[in-house]
């Protein structure tokens, strides 16, 4: 389901002119770089089905015009993501960034405040836009109703996701609210 939401967002959302640049350039035959940057939902084999499906669908339609990088890392949150943003993301010069860390920021052992996810997302958006003002940026957040141990370790997930919603609105980027 997250795969379909992202795919639909990339092809139909026109929040700002920059949000359509990725697709316009692909249609013109220009090469584009896609970077996935998240936690377990984007990297673990059992969770990243949506990443693989999106990649397959884009490759099928645009064949050799796209380079993909999955720079995600399991068990990390926005602190690691911001500290490693230059090496993990900016070094690859993405035209499309799909990222999200609120599900791990909300884990109680990390001792983060809910506003933290949104502020870190803003930092990453600002840094990518400084490098590539035309980059298409997609921020994803996961279900506010996690099950089992995930629910126990993330009692304030809704507040963390809310800070990401605010950041996406403030920065004019695509939000996939799964």
Cite the ranges covered by each PLM segment.
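Sec-dependent N-terminal signal peptides
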Residues: 2-12
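Short histidine/acidic/glycine/proline-rich micro-motifs that form metal-
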Residues: 39-44, 72-76, 104-106, 144-147
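Alpha-helical cap/lid subdomain in secreted, periplasmic
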Residues: 53-64, 80-178
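Serine-esterase "nucleophile elbow" of acetyl-processing enzymes
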Residues: 17-72, 84-93
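Residues within alpha-helical transmembrane segments of multi-pass membrane proteins, especially transporters
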Residues: 11-14, 116
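Short alpha-helical
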Residues: 49, 76, 159
């Amino acid at each position: 389901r997250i795969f379909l939401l992202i795919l639909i967002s990339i092809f139909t959302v026109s929040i700002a002119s920059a949000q359509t640049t990725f697709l316009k350039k692909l249609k013109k035959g220009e090469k584009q770089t896609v970077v996935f940057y998240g936690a377990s939902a984007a990297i673990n084999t059992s969770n990243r089905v949506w990443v693989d499906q999106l990649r397959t669908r884009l490759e099928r339609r645009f064949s050799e015009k796209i380079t993909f990088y999955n720079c995600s890392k399991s068990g990390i949150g926005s602190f690691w993501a911001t500290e490693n943003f230059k090496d993990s993301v900016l070094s690859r010069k993405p035209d499309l960034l799909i990222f999200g860390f609120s599900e791990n920021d909300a884990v109680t052992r990390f001792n983060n405040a809910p506003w933290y996810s949104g502020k870190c997302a803003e930092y990453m958006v600002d840094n990518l836009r400084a490098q590539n003002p035309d980059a298409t940026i997609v921020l994803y957040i996961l279900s506010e109703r996690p099950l089992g141990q995930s629910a126990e370790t993330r009692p304030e997930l809704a507040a963390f996701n809310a800070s990401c919603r605010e950041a996406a609105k403030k920065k004019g980027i695509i939000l996939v609210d799964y």
